[in-house]
Amino acid sequence: MKFYTACALKGNKVLVRGYNNGVRFTDTVTYKPSLYMRTDTPSKYKTLTGVNVGRIKFENLYEAREFLDQYRELEDCPIYGNTDFITQYIMETYASEVEYDLSKIKVAYLDLECETEGGFPNLDAPNERINLVTIRISGVNYVITMKPLNLPDCRVVLVASEKELIKKIFDILRQCDADILTGWNIKLFDMPYIMGRAKLFYEEKEIQAWMPFGFMKMRITNI
């Protein structure tokens, strides 16, 4: 049984993490995507409205992106096909229904605590220090803190500074080989705040190196 847990694009490659017969794998794949354009000749490929289209197979992702840049603004040359190349790769590589072995997928639950001297911490100006982080994964509770704590059911990780605390978060996630990181409001507060504080202590390239694929992408969500 083979299944993926994460896919990402980096330059001209597709990066994939998953499990094959219960064993973790991380692959770097050279993917050759396809797109489609109208044709006057009969074709086995058709649009949802029955228009004949021809398949264009690219040698790599760069070629496909250049093609899109060249033709996407031309009204009389519509491009068909999935231009989300990650989705296209997944649909081709895992064409049948993916059977996941949930016992292999490692889920990490994270929560952080901040000081509140200046009120509730602000994502736009993360000026309140993170003083404690908890991570639960594979039945183990980690507590990363700058103050000694007696918690018999936890692994207390004592650090000397917030800078060290932030680095330790990613050390634990990497050592435990987490597939999924979750928690209460983790997408809208916890992780953005951690990254905001991390940038006060570390260069961007250092932070990128902590990630499973060696890079990260952040996006702004307005609510």
Each predicted region: which residue ranges?
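The two-metal-ion catalytic cores of nucleic-acid processing enzymes
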Residues: 1-223
